[in-house]
């Protein structure tokens, strides 16, 4: 698990566009990004060490009665020295997942700054954002509504579709509905983009 970060952005060009959606998981260090990734992959809690580079996994998520949707998920390290490289990994992504530690309220202002910076980057404008308020299993964790308020999610660009979901990497709570909502937002954006092209 874990690879070194590079300036080269990941690409899904080797995959048919209908086969997998490219999603990047970012957030501050110790927010639980990698634990969430492997909870989705293996359906169990995996204790992880800080990601020094990135992890990537293909994850199939069941949606209703369909066969489900496949996400190619890139989990990128959140240490301060690695954050300038986030843009290389979010370029051309279908969706952003921003993970916060809801039990560590004192770092939410720092998380807010990073969320607004990455979502307003020229390459990411309009990209749907799912905020996962992780560690809901811990006492004192802030609710999704409180996290949404602290991060000023509604102040992101009006063209950016957003959703804040409480979750826990320990028991998997909230992950399925969160990813379903992300998928809906990605589809909505793609449909709007197609409609815009037809009007030209």
From Swiss-Prot:
Keyword presence, Oxidoreductase: no
Keywords (A to Z) from UniProt: Cell membrane, Cytoplasm, GTP-binding, Lipoprotein, Membrane, Myristate, Nucleotide-binding, Nucleus
Biological-process GO terms, alphabetical: intracellular protein transport; vesicle-mediated transport
GO MF, one example: GTPase activity
Superkingdom of the organism of origin: Eukaryota
Lipidated sites in chain (N-myristoyl glycine): 2
One Pfam family here: Arf
This protein's GO CC annotations: cytoplasm; nucleolus; plasma membrane
Binding site for GTP: 27-34, 75-79, 134-137
InterPro entries in the record: P-loop_NTPase (IPR027417), Small_GTP-bd (IPR005225), Small_GTPase_ARF (IPR024156), Small_GTPase_ARF/SAR (IPR006689)
SMART domains in the record: ARF, RAB, SAR
Family membership: Belongs to the small GTPase superfamily. Arf family.
Role according to the record: Small GTP-binding protein which cycles between an inactive GDP-bound and an active GTP-bound form, and the rate of cycling is regulated by guanine nucleotide exchange factors (GEF) and GTPase-activating proteins (GAP). GTP-binding protein that does not act as an allosteric activator of the cholera toxin catalytic subunit. Recruits CYTH1, CYTH2, CYTH3 and CYTH4 to the plasma membrane in GDP-bound form.
Protein name (Swiss-Prot/TrEMBL): ADP-ribosylation factor-like protein 4D
Species assigned in the record: Bos taurus
